[in-house]
Amino acid sequence: MQRHMLKSKIHRAAVTHCELHYEGSCAIDEDLLEAAGLIENERIDIWNINNGERFSTYAIKGERGSGMISLNGSAARRAQLGDLVIIAAFAMVDEAELQAGWKPKLVFIDEGNKIKGHRDHVPTQNWT
């Protein structure tokens, strides 16, 4: 059996560009792509923390070290500059890979869209 699992996540990225008339996609700083294990043309889901919008598009490379998160084409209508977003990708993972210790790549970034940390799991949510 295969399970549809979270593969990659870039958490709380700030939108730096919205390019309505650019061919659709999301340009992501190449450093962030690599850290999250994402590649060009990979399907991504984007969740806008500011307004609750959720949509899918595909990743393209943004300038390395720039902090770029550019929503292009119709996706540009889903956010404003400075909105915080979560960018995620999922993968089909078989039971053997899961049992062998397969883990997602979670990337946490700062206010300038620079990497501030990595994790391979989402912590247990507690009621406190």
UniProtKB/Swiss-Prot annotation:
CDD domains: Asp_decarbox
Subcellular location: Cytoplasm
Molecular function GO terms recorded: aspartate 1-decarboxylase activity
Cofactor: pyruvate
Pathway membership, UniProt: Cofactor biosynthesis; (R)-pantothenate biosynthesis; beta-alanine from L-aspartate: step 1/1
GO CC terms, sorted: cytosol
Recorded catalytic activity of this chain's protein: L-aspartate + H(+) = beta-alanine + CO2
Covalent S-S links between cysteines: none
Family: Belongs to the PanD family.
Official protein name in the record: Aspartate 1-decarboxylase
Organism: Burkholderia cenocepacia (strain ATCC BAA-245 / DSM 16553 / LMG 16656 / NCTC 13227 / J2315 / CF5610) (Burkholderia cepacia (strain J2315))
